[in-house]
């Protein structure tokens, strides 16, 4: 699956106002944790913006704030000036809460558990609600449960019926972390919990 490509407006531009960064991160997590092969268009991992004409959707990668730094380029011609909300890659690499580090962590989780990408996907409709979306993925005898909270509110859900014991990975867009104990999952706003 892909969330954006070179013919579409960049995803960070979809979200404005309160919680725009958290929504941008959550959208990346939902895309990258879908089953199948994931695709990440360059610049999405740092929240680049670009809409309107094709040239503006294909702005040069923002490696550094220094226009003369190694790897920097200009163009394309006819691109509209676009205000960028988030820092360049070099700065985001140093910030543990940046979009870049969130995307990097999401990809690490995807790679650590093959059932996420390759598994048979089951939407747990009876356990999901307005704030929580739950999927079970099974592959080669392994099972993972992914719980997404894409809302601005904290959410709790009992998943004891799914037969999982431990939280093995989590993604948080704020400093508040998800938790899991005795079948009860508690997720702060805009977070993900992976259980096995």
Q: How would you name each of these model-derived features?
A:
Residues 20-21, 163-166, 181:
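Short, glycine- and charge-enriched coil/turn segments that flank and shape catalytic ligand pockets
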Residues 2, 10, 16-155:
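Loop/helix patches that line or flank the sugar-binding groove of alpha-linked glycan CAZymes
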Residues 61, 135, 167, 193-195:
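Short beta-strand element of the conserved SAM-dependent methyltransferase core
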Residues 154-174:
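Beta-strand-rich binding/interaction modules
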């Amino acid at each position: 699956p892909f969330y954006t490509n070179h013919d579409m407006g960049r995803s960070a531009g979809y979200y404005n106002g309160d919680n725009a960064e958290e929504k941008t991160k959550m959208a990346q997590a939902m895309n990258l944790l879908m089953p199948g092969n994931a695709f990440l268009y360059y610049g999405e991992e740092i929240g680049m913006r670009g809409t309107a004409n094709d040239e503006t959707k294909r702005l040069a990668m923002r490696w550094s704030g220094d226009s003369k730094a190694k790897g920097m380029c200009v163009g394309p011609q006819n691109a509209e000036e676009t205000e960028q909300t988030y820092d360049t890659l070099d700065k985001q690499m140093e910030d543990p809460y940046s979009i870049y580090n969130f995307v990097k962590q999401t990809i690490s989780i995807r790679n650590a558990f093959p059932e996420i990408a390759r598994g048979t996907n089951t939407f747990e409709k009876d356990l999901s609600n307005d704030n929580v979306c739950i999927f079970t993925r099974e592959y080669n005898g392994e099972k993972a449960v992914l719980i997404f909270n894409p809302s601005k509110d904290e959410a709790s859900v009992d998943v004891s019926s799914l037969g999982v014991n431990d939280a093995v990975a989590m993604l948080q867009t704020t400093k508040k972390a998800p938790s899991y104990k005795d079948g009860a999952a508690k997720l702060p706003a805009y977070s993900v919990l992976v259980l096995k």
